């Protein structure tokens, strides 16, 4: 069963009336004033209009691409190291978990944790799945698709996260 994948900017169809940033994946990054009071910017200056697309695309929201021959997940995990990340496949799902213990930053102590779960298409070759973390903190999980009728090999296993030294060239669509 394939699931339709929606691009993140569709979620902002209602513009400033839709406070979705509060629920997006922002690991330790503060909220802006317009996140709590979306009407404030339009009341101060009726000509001011904040960029809807830039904030959503740069926000750390995951992106899933599924084309004819490949399935790819991009996830911004810039606050986590490969040791903090666990990626495993269970049946038709990939689970990505990140957690780092409490550590000191500029404002005190902080700990972060997230858990994402994605359904894999039925024709993804699970024996050839790979996962890498770029230098700029972009996690890329990918797997080739097999022709229909060929066994894709479903089993439970952990996928190691490899470290890349170059920045990601991923989701800037």
Curated annotation (Swiss-Prot):
Modifications the protein undergoes after translation, according to the UniProt entry: Acetylation at Lys-70 may increase chaperone activity. Undergoes age-dependent proteolytical cleavage at the C-terminus.
Name of the protein: Alpha-crystallin A chain
Residue ranges of every copy of the sHSP domain listed in the record: 52-162
Gene Ontology CC terms, in alphabetical order: cytoplasm; nucleus
Subunit relationships: Heteromer composed of three CRYAA and one CRYAB subunits. Inter-subunit bridging via zinc ions enhances stability, which is crucial as there is no protein turn over in the lens. Can also form homodimers and homotetramers (dimers of dimers) which serve as the building blocks of homooligomers. Within homooligomers, the zinc-binding motif is created from residues of 3 different molecules. His-100 and Glu-102 from one molecule are ligands of the zinc ion, and His-107 and His-154 residues from additional molecules complete the site with tetrahedral coordination geometry.
Record PTM N-acetylmethionine, positions in chain: 1
Chief location bin: cytoplasm
A molecular-function term among this protein's GO annotations: unfolded protein binding
Residues noted as binding Zn(2+) 2 in the record, renumbered to the chain: 107
């Amino acid at each position: 069963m394939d699931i339709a994948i929606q691009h993140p900017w569709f979620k902002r169809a209602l513009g400033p009336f839709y406070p979705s940033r509060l629920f997006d994946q922002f690991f330790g990054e503060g909220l802006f004033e317009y996140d709590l009071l979306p009407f404030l910017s339009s009341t101060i200056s009726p000509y001011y209009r904040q960029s809807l697309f830039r904030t959503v695309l740069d926000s750390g929201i995951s992106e899933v691409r599924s084309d004819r021959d490949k399935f790819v997940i991009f996830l911004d995990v810039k606050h986590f190291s490969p040791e903090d990340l666990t990626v495993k496949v269970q049946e038709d799902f990939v689970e990505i978990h990140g957690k780092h213990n409490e550590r000191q930053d500029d404002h005190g102590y902080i700990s972060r944790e997230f858990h994402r779960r994605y359904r894999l298409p039925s024709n993804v070759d699970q024996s050839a799945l790979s996962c890498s973390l770029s230098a700029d903190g972009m996690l890329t999980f990918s797997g080739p698709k097999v022709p229909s009728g060929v066994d894709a090999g479903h089993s439970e296993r952990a996928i190691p996260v490899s470290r890349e030294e170059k920045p990601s060239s991923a989701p800037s669509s």
